[in-house]
Amino acid sequence: MSGWVVAAMDALNYAGAVRFTPESDIPDLSGKVILVTGGGLNQVKAEEAIKSVKSSVSNDVEVVWIPLDLMSGKSIKNAAEQVNAQSSRLDVLILNAGVMALPPGETEMGHEIQLGTNHTGHFYLTKLLLPTLLKTAEEPDSDVRVVSLASVGHNFAPAFEKILDQEKLKKSLFAALGSKFLRLSGSTVQQGACNSLWAAAGAKKEELSNGGYHVPVGILERRNKWACNEDMGKRLWEWTELELTKANL
């Protein structure tokens, strides 16, 4: 696979950021299939977003909404099946959805909502879509990427064994171990999207650090020491796989 990108959400761009204008710096993506999670809270919101996107792109660009509840294993499986049914390829997967500061609660797997949504749900979705990603990566001139949005908040996480802020750290470890993957950051809605767009489509292969952590825009940044720890990453991966097995997923 060409690259696994982690994207961190930041309030400010960093000094030394690369020059990047999505409108002019993203190459022609004709024929590519891109999946972005978190495109709308519900069908109405998603359709409003799709209408807005279609008003500014060519008519031959197909934009569709696929229902996905990252707290539900069944919903995740259904979404992956719909993706594979609609296309035999997947060029870019952007793990954009995320929640925080919600009332206490659990996902169907029995995980705390924030952890279950931001980490476990995306892990399961990626696992189901991995065969399609790998198949696409085998094609000539392919450039398959997985972008995982995270946060500089992972730097404030305490020791790995403690719970506070661990879902941010888990996303960092997940991406770092995955292939090994990448990462990014943001500001306003428009500015915040730039780092993800850069990693997903704007950056050339040689500009990406597979498994690295990129902050806005395109700067390879050092990560929390736990996020760089391969043993911790292995433990997280194995724990997540075990949790999926326990949930019969």
Set out the residue ranges of the language-model regions.
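Short, solvent-exposed loop/helix junctions and linker helices
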Residues: G116-H119, G186-V189, E230
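Pocket-edge positions in alpha/beta enzyme catalytic cores
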Residues: L68, L184, K225-C228
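Short alpha-helical patches at coil-to-helix transitions and adjacent helical residues
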Residues: G73, H119-H122, V189, A193-S196, ...
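Rossmann-fold NAD(P)H-dependent dehydrogenase/reductase core
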Residues: G3-W4, D10-F174, A247-L249
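C-terminal tail/cap regions
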Residues: S2-D10, K204-L249
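SDR active-site lid
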Residues: K162-I163, E167-S209, P216
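Short, amphipathic alpha-helical "lid/cap" segments that border enzyme active or binding sites
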Residues: K77-A80, V189-A200, E230-E241
